[in-house]
């Protein structure tokens, strides 16, 4: 045999042996354990290497399949367990360098388009070599070979990334191999002794490929076709490795002197430059820039390479900053380096545009410039004083050149252009100050209306300018410059609004912090410009001039309405300055009001707008100053009202803004009258009517046009929204002075807008912006409307009128004529003698007419348009607050809805679904109205039983006519539910108001019993089950309400018991008819189960009210048992609807109670059967976590019922059942549903009330349960997919055990082990839902421990705080600021905010217990600031965490603060000092102030 096997080697070397045979022999030699070739592994490696080398050197020829087989053979060997075992034993095996070269060449061929063999196999071979420390020596020992491999792999992956438009999927293997190569290369690079050699190798071969790859990874638009592993993990890891390679190769500290020599412009460093020649790198920066400034072969490639260069320059500068500028050193070198990099973007040394620069590159160029300037800002390399004193303002002059570059080449449509200017402003405001007028013109006054991103960047820049000059206390200077720009001749008359919302908000904030004198100075400056620009030229009628003055008037209004008002503490000189300003302003307003403008047109409109705006500003400010400052006396108190009157006398006002300002002045006049002790109501009524302007409201259009609260944006399309907002926001002031006609017009306009809003969006309004529709909806839902009874009544009457307005009046005259008759016409002497008001007589007549119409089966036919119109009106009605309605309005609305429900009829079958929807909405609205306080008035108009009978008669009539035959199951069930809610609410009203309870209920029960018999006969004859189902729904509602009344009155109980017996007697045959009928498929199984459950509970209620043991009272027990058995069959074998499961569990609970009551023989078996069924249900593989959560409530109720009289044997059996599920091994075995079932039952069982013997048994084995749960948590936490499914429920069960066992768990070790389990719960899930559930579960467990076991918490405080720190750290990581593309959804942000609130809450609880371990307070603060230093938090997240840590700082004494300042590292110390400063300024002072008044 040895001879045979030894011949294998000879045959492999023999040139006559065919290559396919050689390959087979080689495979056999590797696999066979009996092949005893000496050093077999090395021999086979050498043979494979030789074969591949010969082929690729073209010394031999092979078929393609043999070449493919050789690579596959090599790959199989490299990844085999056998080779791994051989290498792990220390045996030396080596590959030849030619293999590495061949692999490198094949990668190059593939990138070039030559694809001869399976490239995936070659990459797999490369991966196998590099992941083996022994075999990877062929690359790591030859640095240049590894560089070549990395360069070619970068080219390969870059080629794949660039081919996105060809829709070819990315090769996962290529990126995996690239990451392995990068890791190996980084290790080898760090081991190189000669840093210059590394620099030249990287710049010559790797720099551009790596930067291109990084750029493509950053800018790729990832799609679902891309592999998730590449998108989420590999791309980030590769970018990190690339950064590490470049930074360590190009910016070593050893190279600093070389860079310094190259970029330093000083002549006195010439000697250093000469001495350095030959010692280090020559022109390293120039070498780098030469390598990255590559020109493309085409337009597309040229644009790509410029983008790579631009993005790379800011990255390289960041590397240089991190490497050379640690501790604030070498700032001057860094600056000169940055200057060179900025020049490399395509500019000359003087920062002019290079002749080869393309205009299309501006966007990318400005982004790079922005990043460079921001890095400069973050690195703090610009010290203004040092630059001016020591370096002759070198940096300042350079930044001035950058500013001029930006202004000379304005890119108004590029957001980065504005951000670059903002960065220069942040460096030093003096950089932009020489060009301040140009800046204000370009970005503020003359800026064009642009897209959202550009507008945001522009507004951010203007806001930054305002904030900067506010801090410098130079706002007057800035405003003066702004006024100069505004007053210049405009290139275009249509200038944008001077004060958009964002800029106005910033200006207001700046003015609040600004000294009052300066604010008054600003107002004076604006007023002087208005005087100089407008008054001398008022007859010139120049529209451009009017627009400018209007802009300045808006600015004056914004300034006066923004700074703090005068008060009694204001110094007298400031009051005098204010008085002088107000006097001058009054003079201007009066002069404008006295002007007589000859011609109409835009000029006149603008002048009137300016006049009214200044008048409104003056009277509001004057009134405010008078109210708050007694030192201030109005320039002319008598002239204030005269001024308003003159302004209101400006007629023929066509300008929308002018009309709005007149309304504001009228409102001011109304407020002034209200402040007086006596005022004429006629004058106030006149002002209120002027503000409302019912002529305009009656013809209002554009109800959905949005308005942004800005005066400058009030025009013909937005005026309606602005006017409606003014009216509604001041409704409490003007409503008392409106006559009925005004209120009616207001209500009609409001209803019209509400209906239009429903037409536009289906059922609800979109809460974006302010429009007439949105304002009306918000007013309808707000409590303000409820507090205005006249307006509310007008709206209710308007809705009633609209409901009848859609119907044919001739039909309504026949059915219910009293609706169309005013109340006064119904007055009769007899009624007056009886004390009945005309309105009550009318309403009673309506009720009688409605009952008569039902009896006579009268109807009103409806078209499709009428049905849709009524549906919209009913939806609006559903939002009305029934508690706010007057007695008469409530009754009229309810009777209107009831009449509609009883009489309307659908004439077209095509509209049937909309008609059923209308009926459903009508029943729902009536049910909600029955909950209001005036609901008892209904029973004074119509007897309760008559109302119930009329409703059911109509429904039975509709059913017999076949109205419901074509309905699908969900629609029919939804309709039944609305009917049931209404019937139940009405019966509850009869019972609660004690309105002849026995008489009404007995009459209605008898009516239903008689109708039930008729319906069953009809069902047998026609197969129509709808009437029968309506009977069952109604009888169920009737029985439920009667059951809730039992036990209050003995005589009443006897009557109700009789009625319950009467009702249940007919329900059993009815439900059996439904179950056997063909139409039962329309109903869900839950319907039948709920009905039978009601029947059982009725019988139980009757049995409980009787004196005997109840055995003979439950007569239908056989029927209930058969139903029970059917439920057990259908409960868990396969998926079932959730409503069926919930109703079935309720039925099991009721049936068990009935079984206990009747003392059935097999009660113990029944008990175990139910428990086994519930466990099997919860263990179902189809049950999701959401389903289990939804079933927890019903199952808890059932367990309480089962455990209340549980025997010791039954309880023991149940615990044994649970023990089988609490096995951690089942998690690994994939039986998670069984484990979840046991965990859920344990959690619910802990909340049950046990008999004493069961309670002792349960809490005795609780330590074992806790241990099992901990093992389950540990096992499930290994798989991220099980976090929410099993880990969190297990933790919730532990928390419940801790809370419920507060008095029973005495061993502290049982609590401490729970703390240990919390360490295993993963808090790094990619899914926010999983993260939030895990976070909340850990928090609740910690809260249970701190609340129920404070002594244990103190004993194990380090472990407790470590668990809590995991929460803090995770919420900081998740709550860090992210880019726009990586920003979380609104739902995720809300979940994260909840987590932050929980952390704040826990901090407060820890702080309340911190008095017992104050030593750890400083430790908690140190942990917090250390984590805070690493991330930039979202403001709302930071706010909650900061409030929480403040509570811990309350317990830090001075010694702790000194300790923290001493031990914390430099960066962390700065964060702590900032935190402690804000704590001292805001929180500590407030707390001390509160303590001052605390007893």
From Swiss-Prot:
UniProt record, GO biological process: regulation of hematopoietic stem cell differentiation; regulation of signal transduction by p53 class mediator; ribosome biogenesis
Compartments, record wording: Nucleus, Nucleolus
UniProt-listed Pfam families: Urb2 (PF10441)
Cellular component terms per the entry's GO annotation: nucleolus
Disruption phenotype: Mutants show a notable decrease in the population of hematopietic stem cells in caudal hematopoietic tissue and early T-cells in thymus. Compromised cell proliferation and excessive apoptosis are observed in the caudal hematopoietic tissue.
InterPro entries (alphabetical): Ribosome_Biogenesis_Reg (IPR052609), Urb2/Npa2_C (IPR018849)
Superkingdom: Eukaryota
Subcellular location, principal: nucleus
Keyword terms, alphabetized: Nucleus
Xref: PANTHER family: UNHEALTHY RIBOSOME BIOGENESIS PROTEIN 2 HOMOLOG
Function in brief: Essential for hematopietic stem cell development through the regulation of p53/TP53 pathway.
Protein name: Unhealthy ribosome biogenesis protein 2 homolog
